[in-house]
A protein has these predicted regions:
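Active-site-adjacent beta->alpha loops and helix N-cap segments on the catalytic face
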Residues: 68-83, 99-105, 124-138, 199-206
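A general structural detector for well-ordered alpha-helical segments in enzyme core domains, enriched
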Residues: 44, 48, 76-80, 106, ...
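Long, hydrophobic, well-ordered secondary-structure blocks that form the structural core
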Residues: 89-97
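Conserved N-terminal beta1-alpha1 strand-loop-helix module at the mouth
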Residues: 1-89
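Short helix-capping segments at alpha-helix termini
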Residues: 85-88, 182-187, 208
Length: 208
């Protein structure tokens, strides 16, 4: 079992829950006081963490909402590691994906500067392009596979022709098949993002 999965399992056992708390400070759902400034946002984050720390097996941070506040917002995102219990894993929901040195920079930013234990990433430039993220054997990657947004079927359910290594199938199933074949998957360092609104997809994904 990978370090991340061990950390997550221990955290879940400690709090008696599998709850992952989203830190998604959408200004549309915050009070004016909390949305108006980074200081207000920091207070909202503190209240949320204090109210959920005894129940949360993990925290998922939507970094875009912090980036929208500029440099001070990103600095607040860096503080989240210190604000949450040290033994509770943090997932950075960033859906990153690029190539070469850009992914190396993303890995440093997410894992080192922000202290993420796991991140979400897009496989659509090729899973191998994410090597700098995958090479961190103490971290975990959730690959976008079958997402819950209404537009997802436009690409994710496209039928692909069969190859020597795979049958004819939808694109999201091919992503899952390619991910499962990676050595990082065997080491417990790759997971999939599959939206709960696509219940039928779960059955197919478990068969891959």
């Amino acid at each position: 079992m990978s370090r991340y999965l061990e950390l997550l399992a221990a955290s879940s056992q400690r709090v008696g829950s599998s709850l992952c708390v989203g830190i998604d400070p959408d200004p549309a759902h915050l009070s004016l006081e909390h949305a108006a400034s980074v200081a207000g946002l920091r207070e909202w984050v503190r209240i949320l963490i204090n109210a959920t720390a005894q129940y949360a097996a993990a925290y998922k941070v939507n970094l875009a909402f912090f980036e929208a506040y500029g440099a001070e917002g990103v600095a607040l995102a860096e503080e989240i590691r210190a604000l949450t219990p040290a033994e509770t894993p943090i997932i950075m929901d960033v859906k990153r994906g690029d190539i070469g040195n850009t992914v190396k920079a993303q890995a440093r930013a997410l894992f080192d500067a922000l202290g993420a234990d796991a991140v979400t990433a897009s496989p659509y430039l090729g899973i191998g392009a994410l090597a700098p993220l995958l090479e961190r054997d103490d971290r975990f990657i959730y690959l976008l596979c079958r997402t819950s947004n209404p537009e997802s079927a436009e690409l994710q359910e496209l039928r692909l022709t069969a190859t020597e290594a795979a049958p004819e199938e939808e694109l999201y199933l091919r992503v899952a098949r390619l991910a499962a074949a990676r050595p990082e998957a065997l080491a417990g360092r790759i997971g999939l993002v599959a939206g709960a609104t696509a219940g039928g997809a779960f059955i197919k994904l478990r068969e891959v």
